[in-house]
Amino acid sequence: MVKKLGLNFKNTKTSVSELKQRIVFLIVAIIVFRIGSFIPIPGIDTTILSKILNNQNGTIVDMFNMFSGGALSRASIFALGIMPYISASIIIQLLTLVYPTLSEIKKEGESGRHRINQYTRYATLILALVQSIGIAMTLPNIAGIRSIIINTDFYFYLIAIISLVTSTMFLMWLGELITEYGIGNGISIIIFIGIIAGLPSAIGNTIEKTRQGDLHILLFLFILLLIFSVIFLVVFMERGQRKIVVHYAQRQQGRRIYETPSTHLPLKINMAGVIPAIFASSIVLFPATIISWCKVNHEWLTKILFYLQPNQFLYLILYISAIVFFCFFYTGLVFNPRETADNLKKSGAFISGIRPGEQTAKYINKIMLRLTLVGSLYITFICLIPEFMRSAMNVPFYFGGTSLLIVVVVIIDFITQIQTLIMSNQYESMLKKANLN
């Protein structure tokens, strides 16, 4: 009895200790990331650059600056953030559909996953190099102001490119360490921290505006109610699933026939996650950003720039269309109904009233199309709420729809990871107790 109590106490202590270690590691990693976001690239007058980039509201620069926790506006070594890694991951996923060799590697299990990760790292290095060269070459010519660069010689470009590339690779490595030794997905955590870095000052500014009477108290309360409602909707939709009941063939042992219990195939409503919102924002904002950087006095370019500004009708149409397109595109990329149907058939599973194989694939695909349509409408709604708040009601809204989605999804994943860690430790404890008996 005493031995059992001692083992139970030891297992509980080990579980709490492991959770503490992971949380401490996560906090240290976050501190390292935030410190790095304040280290400037050598040779840049960050004060002038910050003033210039503050005028880039509603452009792709503004979005990347938020994802990097303000590192871009400070010309920090972390200015590229983790975006090259995200782009590289999506490119590699696309290539697995085009090249059969990569598709076969992906199916090799743990070894295949390791090789795909290596290819993703190489692609990240290439993208980071290209983007860092672009930033280094663009910085001296932003808005035609050359005074932000103290000395525009060869060594400035070399140091800037090396600083940006190595910092991006460091962030990728830090994200992988967080995934392994911390809690949650490391890359998502880094993006999450970057987004919420400016949240305290935004809350303070909103409260100050309310206190001074610039923002009506009822409007302030409405904003709070809206935020909580949106968070509730995001949690509900992200946790929502369509469960398809799956049966297994009867198992015969000797003369007896055993009925195998049925299970279900869970299909998420929003299978694409936040990727469609990120890609849609990037693509729609990119042309306007490039035009605003180029000092070209063509009337037709000025008109294009005007119509591609946030809250303009053309911008909203393109934005909504891009979100819906990428929802269907990315869902088709990460989920293959035919492959799922083949796996069910191989394991002896079937859906009641549906023939295994081709008919099952068509049935699953039909359900996925409906779920993706609902998911795309949900993401579009979330992404348009901040636009409506800013334009129609002239309300300061710190989060964009993309950022709000990322924040809530990462928090959900973080809580799930903690619950999983606690449950796995409790399960191990139960197994040890059973072996002791």
From Swiss-Prot:
Subcellular locations according to the entry: Cell membrane
Name this polypeptide is given: Protein translocase subunit SecY
Family of the protein in this entry: Belongs to the SecY/SEC61-alpha family.
Keywords noted in UniProt: Cell membrane, Membrane, Protein transport, Translocation, Transmembrane, Transmembrane helix, Transport
Transmembrane domains' residue ranges: 23-43, 77-97, 125-145, 154-174, 183-203, 217-237, 271-291, 315-335, 367-387, 395-415
Described function: The central subunit of the protein translocation channel SecYEG. Consists of two halves formed by TMs 1-5 and 6-10. These two domains form a lateral gate at the front which open onto the bilayer between TMs 2 and 7, and are clamped together by SecE at the back. The channel is closed by both a pore ring composed of hydrophobic SecY resides and a short helix (helix 2A) on the extracellular side of the membrane which forms a plug. The plug probably moves laterally to allow the channel to open. The ring and the pore may move independently.
Assembly and binders: Component of the Sec protein translocase complex. Heterotrimer consisting of SecY, SecE and SecG subunits. The heterotrimers can form oligomers, although 1 heterotrimer is thought to be able to translocate proteins. Interacts with the ribosome. Interacts with SecDF, and other proteins may be involved. Interacts with SecA.
Native species: Buchnera aphidicola subsp. Acyrthosiphon pisum (strain APS) (Acyrthosiphon pisum symbiotic bacterium)
Main subcellular localisation: membrane
Pfam families documented for this protein: SecY
Membrane topology, from the record: Multi-pass membrane protein
Gene: secY
InterPro entries in alphabetical order: SecY, SecY/SEC61-alpha, SecY_CS, SecY_dom_sf
Gene3D superfamilies: SecY subunit domain
Any GO BP: protein targeting
Keyword Protein transport among record annotations: yes
